Amino acid sequence: MKLVVRLFSMRAVVMQGPQLVVGTVPDPRPGPGQLLVKTLVCGICGSDLHMLKSARQIYEASKETQEPLRTDPSKDIVMGHEFCAEILDYGSGTRRSLAVGSRVCSMPFAIRGNGVIAAVGYSNDFPGGYGEQMVLEESLLVEVPNGLDTDRAALTEPMAVGAHAVEKAQLGGDEVPVVIGCGPVGLAVIASLRLRGVGPIIAADYSPTRRGLAEQMGADVI
């Protein structure tokens, strides 16, 4: 019989200053209204690259906003907010509406005991998808439907950013939208515009590869 001992720590890619280090961090534990999940897939967001390079500057600049970044960039951070995960266990006060083993995506936020919102993947106490496990809010979960593979499900967060931008634009239907920058979010904007039947869609990017992807996603003029 094989004995497996888990010493209450998980492996993770940890941001330590301007570098990423593979190491171990304490296992996260779900609080009231939260659940524990296992990371299945996690994407690398452009914001993660900016954070790795300029965490201190981002932290200082965030103080000028209504939602300052509540983290200490001098301490360990486990990034990753574009993920698909599997439910492992529930904390107290949860509805348990999804079975253990269900695949989920989520808005990357958690609520601390004092009611303050923390960004999963950008806080010192809520590790993101670069770790083996995460704590998520049950109320912010989205179940992955059958037939959608895990890799594609992990694109839910960046796709939602693009869809939200189109929703905020409140287009009447006769506008000609221009999408400048055809990275993942720009492509998500193009896809959302196409789904709404808005067009013609103009897209611009320096990269020939991204311009090609923009055309595949439904842009009319590149």
What are the functions of these language-model segments?
Residues 6-13:
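Short structural boundary motif marking the start of a folded domain
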Residues 15, 42-45:
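Disulfide-bonded cysteines in secreted/extracellular proteins and peptides
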Residues 19-23, 46-47, 113:
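Short N-terminal binding/cap micro-motifs at the start of the first secondary-structure element
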Residues 69-76, 81, 106-180:
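NAD(P)H dinucleotide-binding glycine-rich loop of Rossmann-like/cofactor-binding domains
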Residues 148-222:
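Mid-domain Rossmann-like dinucleotide-binding core that forms the NAD(H)/NADP(H) cofactor-binding site
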Residues 28-42, 57-110, 145-147:
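Glycine-rich beta-strand-centered segment in the early N-terminal region that forms part
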Residues 50-58:
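Short Gly/aromatic-enriched secondary-structure transition segments
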Residues 12, 22-24, 36, 84-86, ...:
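Conserved hydrophobic/aromatic beta-strand scaffold that supports enzyme active sites
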